[in-house]
Amino acid sequence: MSEHTDVLVLGGAGVDTIAYVPELPLPFQDSYVVAAIEPRAGQTGDNVALGLHTLGLRTMHVDVLGDDPEGDLVRAFHTRHGLPFAALPTAAGTKRAVNLVGPDGRRLSLWDGSREAEEDRYPAALIAAHTAHARHVHVCITPPGQHVFGQLNDLPVTVSTDLHNWDGAYEGFEVYAFNADLVFLSATALTDVAATMRRVIDRGRARLVVATDGAHGGSVLVRGETEVRRYAAVAPEAPVVDSNGAGDAFVSGFLFGHLAGEPLETCLRYGAIAGAYACTIPATRAGAIDRAALLRPAA
């Protein structure tokens, strides 16, 4: 493991098949004619790793992959972007999903739940080697990430996770919510955003919780503070075409600021800028904001 690693990203490597549909929700009918349906690598871990890498942070990505066409796409993605990647074999196959994308950029994701193997683990020796000199670890909510916190909690490294559209009740994500120092999630499925954020702080080790809410900005709660703060969204500089990956981009932008020692307000702005940029990139191609573009509006 290089001693010059800023962030280790665990999990979230996979393939999405993108279908642009005339509207969401999609009314029932026998068939629809849509534009080209394209499979492409770039699930949450791929996106976070690419975002950090593009911002100049030295990034290592580790995940389980199948010996299948989807795995080949993921390997090619990392090679194409010069992104260091360690693939561990899994009999379950590479993670995959079908994403329906509406004209306004909103996404409905159909996750293939068959591509998970209970026996999969990140080897302890591998984690030890890759965290020996890392500054930070980002754990995606994909198996076998739920098993790694026992080891990470004993290491002098900060940890983040993104709970995506967690409803605050699903117990399977609590291991992530309660064992990370920085917790990100979407507000879309939460009935009480503030209560969920306080529960994550009270039950776990989080230093702060960020709930993103798209064009409405979002909320942040810091340990030791009683009030939930609001932060503003950033208007995209180009038309919105796809929200896929916006949350991943927010995480990348926020972590860039956090690891640079920037104040919370700056980290939130970096995240908002990166997320807005991601909404202007079609999901059928990979693209992340670079450092110059991120810093230009924030200056």
Swiss-Prot record:
Gene3D superfamilies linked: 3.40.1190.20
Catalysed reaction equations from the record: acarbose + ATP = acarbose 7(IV)-phosphate + ADP + H(+)
Gene Ontology terms for molecular function: kinase activity
Domain of life: Bacteria
A Pfam family that the UniProt record links to this protein: PfkB
InterPro entries: Carboh/pur_kinase_PfkB_CS, PfkB_dom, Ribokinase-like
The EC number(s) this enzyme carries: 2.7.1.187
Keywords for the protein's UniProt record, in alphabetical order: Kinase, Transferase
Similarity comment: Belongs to the carbohydrate kinase PfkB family.
Family matches, as PANTHER family: RIBOKINASE, SUGAR KINASE
Cited function: Catalyzes the phosphorylation of the alpha-glucosidase inhibitor acarbose. Phosphorylation of acarbose could be a resistance-like self-protection mechanism.
Name of the protein in question: Acarbose 7(IV)-phosphotransferase
Organism whose genome encodes this protein: Actinoplanes sp. (strain ATCC 31044 / CBS 674.73 / SE50/110)
